[in-house]
Amino acid sequence: MASTLDRSIHHIDNFIDLIWLEKGLSPNTLSAYRQDLVSFNLWLKGKEIEAVKKADLLDYLSFRLKEGYSSRSTARCLSSLRAFYNYICAELNLADNPTAKIDSPKQGHTLPKVLSEDDVEALILAPNIDDPIGLRDRAMLEVLYACGLRVSELINLNLLSINIRQGVVRVMGKGKKERLVPLGEEALSWINKYLEEARTSLSVDNINDSALFLSKRGKAMTRQTFWYRIKEYALKADV
């Protein structure tokens, strides 16, 4: 049975997927969001995220300031929590948003960096396609952006999800609802290249994994592994 923290992390990761897709935030900004939210949930010491009240948030913000965090950092943290609870209230049908009517510290904070089209292009071009892992990552990024998938949807694709002839991918979304998404010529081309030149070298004889995108151990990619790779490419591409 999943722990309270595990369930909270699941909600956090789904939220991060959503804002990356909807807002196009840079990997560094997304990492900061996630760190803010995970730190808060660790501080809660097992309290359910849906049980959090305004008083809990005020106590946490006070704790941060007493620990020496700057007003700028605390304002950013509150911004992360506000966005997260807007998502959670909609996701879990909660009536009361605990971040409502909480004022940010007076000092301003810089706006999160949003990826431009050039940034996205640089990120997609960052993997070394002469390497099987890099070729896999290039195909994943092409599919992610061409189809507008969440990371969780991307890593859950299997070989039967792709219809090469029709050029579509079958995606299992929220509530186990399926949808067909056109791949586009570029993404389809990279999937074909990955399947022909890289996937076989990543598969392991004694592991029969039908996942489309395999890790170097021949198993399905995890969200954590994908984000680690993205952060590396973001540094390489300077985005």
What annotation goes with each model-predicted range?
Residues 1-239:
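Conserved catalytic core of the tyrosine transesterase superfamily
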